[in-house]
Amino acid sequence: MENNIENFDPSLVYFGDRGQDFKKMIRSILSLGMSDEYIPYLTTPESLNTYNTAFTSRGADDKNNYEMFEQLGDVSVNKFIVNYMYKRFPQLRNPNGVDVVAKLKIKYASKNQLQMLSESLDMWRFITATYDERTNKKKPLLEDTFESFFGATEWLIDSFIEDIALKQGNNNTYVGVGYNIINGILTTLFDRINISLKYENLVDAKTRFNEVIAEQKSIIGDVKYEDEYKNGKHTSKIYRYPPNSNLKELLGIGTGTLKRDAQEQAASRALETLALKHNIIKEAPDRFKAFM
């Protein structure tokens, strides 16, 4: 057994389930924004073959993988998020709200957010990828597959509508029908999310930490990140070097499978330390206060 573990090849491929459960998963997602009578058109063997590609990483298959659909889906998902935020929060429909919507887009189109949505839709067990990818790149895989699913769905619908038009002798193109469907699915998903317009919820901890350092540098002094990677885990420590002192103070420690996640956690704890021990608090910028 030990020899098997030692000789295990992480480049080997995990093949996601492509049986009835895969079809049920596709149907369940489509039903969030599509009438049941039309779903069978997207669960034909040909369509499921497209979804198979949309759930396959490049590491698993360098020729038939989700990269094209992920690129298409990335554009559509980002467009949806901006439009959705203006519809959900009409008070942001003005020049002062543009920056807030930009922050909303960064947060809700982020790897963390999209991978959580992907997991909530039970996509993980259906993703075909190398064992190395599934072990060390879970978040990127989930994010890419989420975007790829919507890119593939939009592509399938537009292609289906175009084929019907051509058979009827209509050479017009009907771009946008597919987006309308995925817009409905995404709206259902995002309506379930409790979205806050508070500055501390919109702007990541590392950015807020950097801002407070810039504003209070004369009091806080210099700051340094010390990062370490060991046994598949990143550890980040943040130290401050107070002015006119030879001492250094540990402000926060963070860990994560990704370096930026470790730094984000460390920055969050550093903000807490500055507030609790030194009464240094990062105030929300005026452009955010109007919407909080």
UniProtKB/Swiss-Prot annotation:
Disulphide bond pairs: none
Assigned keywords, A-Z: Endonuclease, Hydrolase, Nuclease, RNA-binding
GO BP annotations listed: RNA processing
Enzyme class label: hydrolase
Lineage summary: Viruses, Varidnaviria, Bamfordvirae, Nucleocytoviricota, Megaviricetes
Keyword Nucleotide-binding attributed: no
One term of GO molecular function: RNA binding
Family listed: Belongs to the IIV-6 142R family.
SMART domains, A to Z: RIBOc (SM00535)
Catalytic activity: Endonucleolytic cleavage to 5'-phosphomonoester
Pfam families listed in its UniProt record: Ribonuclease_3 (PF00636)
Secretion signal span: none
Protein name: Putative ribonuclease 3
Coiled-coil regions, chain positions: none
SUPFAM superfamilies: dsRNA-binding domain-like (SSF54768), RNase III domain-like (SSF69065)
Domain DRBM per the UniProt entry, residue ranges: 204-276
InterPro entries for this protein: dsRBD_dom, RNase_III_dom, RNase_III_sf
UniProt domain RNase III: residue ranges: 32-158
Superkingdom, taxonomy of origin: Viruses
EC number(s) given by UniProt: 3.1.26.3
Species name: Invertebrate iridescent virus 6 (IIV-6)
